[in-house]
Amino acid sequence: MKYIDILERKLGRKATKAEIEAFTVMWSEHCGYSHTKGYIRQLPRVGFGGNAGIVPLDDYHFIAFKVESHNHPSAVEPFNGAATGVGGIIRDILAMGARPTAVLDSLHMDKITEGIIDGISDYGNSIGVPTVGGELRISNYYKYNPLVNVMAVGIGKNEHLIPSMAKRAGQVIVIFGGATGRDGIHGASFASEDLTGEKATKLSIQVGDPFAEKMLIEAFLEMVEEGLVEGAQDLGAGGVLSATSELVAKADLGAVVHLERIALREPDMNPVEILISESQERMAVVTSPEKADRVIEIARKHLLFADIAAEVTKTGQYVAKYNGKTVIDVPAKLLEESPEESIYDYTPSEMPKFSWIKFKDIDAHEVFERYDYMVGTDTVVKPGYGPAVMRVKGSCGYSLVIHSRADLGFQDPYWAAYITLLESVRKTLAVGARPLAITDGINYADPDVEPEGLAAQMMGLKNACEFSNVPVASGNASLYNTYKGKGIPPTLVIGMIGKLEDLNVPRPKKGPVYALGFKDFELEREKILWNEIERIAKSGHFVVSMHDFSTMSTLKSELQNVGLEMKLKIPKCEPAHQLVVVFGDVETKLPKELIGYVR
């Protein structure tokens, strides 16, 4: 264990073997964010700190959303790695009291990996949540370290918003869902290391059951509707240990956990294995003792295992027992207070002259066709046509973007992050939506070897958010994406939520095509472009559609998807440009300096 000296100094004694196992999980990079939490505190934030980020949508509803990575598991076992990535992020949304409504994915691979695509489509289609958008980037940089970033979104009623912590001593914690096995043991530690060597084993990969997930979704939402849920956590990385300790540590409380009450799939598991297993489709619910029987009744009605697994105490101690024998007894807050690495003092430079880094041109349409993107009947704009657009029946609409610029990451991580955010804003504005907030997926190689690259990426994100006035609501960090010392490009994935007040803006069916904007990037021009994009997007009577494009291949794909078989002559652009393609009669509606190259 990397931090064992720090642990024993804080405990004031030698740590037991069981405690070392527990803190190895909780203080891993995956759970503890040792290298990134100093940077995360500097970000402009909103609705931050729960299982997922939240922003208000209207007077009655909130949106919960988050991006999560499952990179290491997908490299070792593509199908289960990708599938459980979908399942885990869905439960994060669910734990906020929201019904999951959409999934998007950002995939970076050296070739189309059928197992990853099948894992996402099989899980999402089976649980009835539409996969409404995404991006697919193909490059040899990701040969040994594919990136699988999944974004999930949900809508909840304001009165059903669930906190991610207990409220008082005397409450109980019910764990319900699927049975617990050995799959995923030390998965959090595995996800915090280089993929080289014997640790990259299938034992560390969780195995998903989408039908159990569907039952869990409906059971939990029924509990929420009946007012039974007073706090909730998904059982993801760190399993029972992580979920139950987080619930009490945030409230300066303690817990006594009874491990013999956890339903097992493998009856010979030892107490520590039960404590840290990352078996999927499980949740922890905080409730009052008098409500616990009804919580268990609902779970079992949906064919799920359930029992009171813990009591909330006022001691501040986290005590895990097995048949009355203490397994660990440590301060609950200590489990959550992983050591923090110092942040790197980075000073950005002027934006460089970027060169094109070739990513393979692919038609993502064949991937989208495997996804059920219309289930739920709330998908307004289907995949491949720019940002996804969803409706809330009886209310407004919202847009969903997931975007990255890995092609710029090696050249300058600061400006790559900055430009990724700006382009996400353009994409959101182009469908007539107002950006509300983002969720970030930080994908990086080895921060111990190259700390300046991580610092640059984080500062680029921070400064771009401040420039755009778009806060961060949630996020994820995946580090040590390396194989035999060779790492991926710094790859920031941004998921953006936007709000559409009116989904019924009339549109013409045809019109001329324009390239709008500037072929060279200048930051001071950006808000000029945004203002005009927003204005013409909302003036629907003369605009057929509008698309930001990040690369020429992206433009080509979107032209094909809207049925345009044409050669559009776009001026030769820099890799960082400020161009939007507009289909519609806008020439007389815009300032001359913004109209580019009418064809």
Specify the residue positions occupied by each region the protein language model found:
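Glycine/proline-enriched, intrinsically flexible loops and inter-domain linkers
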Residues: M1-R599
